[in-house]
């Protein structure tokens, strides 16, 4: 999709948008970074042949390793479902996210935890990814424009419950 220039392209229907994992809005880089891109483009082009090639089997092996070694607590899954249900029931939401989006976010959460050097998914991981996974899956009611506010409102109570259950578990472990 190219919302700036729709010539020859058409917006996808909502069910087809559900097939994309993330919606990421990118801003232009700052002036200094843009100058650096211009100054180093030949270097990057010349070294592109030296890039390490990753095979399909490498990717599948990494996926298996992450799946086996990065734990997703039941409390994280519960918070995810509760947030989704709140979104679906919110009067500001015309169409909520699908269960498919919940299934798809789980491995993404595991990868983010791995990148952050952990063997478990945290509430912070959920807060980081959820807006990007749900932004294009939730259709707001007419007149409602701020998806992030709606999401924050729907996340508040489940995330507070998650924090309490995590704290309770940590206290029980140290006692």
Regions found by a protein language model. Name each.
Residues 14, 31-32, 56, 74, ...:
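Alpha-helix N-capping/helix-start residues
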Residues 1-54, 61-68, 110-113:
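Canonical AAA+ ATPase core
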């Amino acid at each position: 999709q190219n919302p700036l220039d729709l010539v020859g392209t058409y917006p996808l229907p909502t069910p087809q948008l559900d097939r994309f994992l993330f919606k990421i809005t990118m801003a232009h880089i700052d002036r200094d970074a843009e100058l650096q891109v211009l100054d180093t483009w030949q270097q990057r082009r010349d070294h592109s042949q030296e890039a390490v090639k990753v095979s399909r089997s490498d990717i599948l092996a990494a996926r298996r390793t992450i799946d086996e070694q990065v734990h997703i607590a039941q409390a994280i899954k519960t918070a995810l479902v509760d947030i989704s249900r709140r979104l679906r029931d919110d009067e500001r939401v015309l169409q909520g996210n699908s269960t498919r989006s919940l299934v798809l976010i789980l491995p993404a959460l595991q990868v983010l935890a791995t990148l952050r050097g952990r063997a478990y998914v945290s509430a912070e991981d959920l807060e980081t990814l959820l807006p990007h996974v749900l932004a294009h899956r939730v259709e707001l009611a007419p007149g409602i424009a701020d998806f992030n506010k709606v999401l924050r409102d729907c996340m508040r109570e489940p995330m507070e419950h998650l924090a309490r259950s995590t704290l309770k578990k940590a206290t029980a472990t140290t006692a």
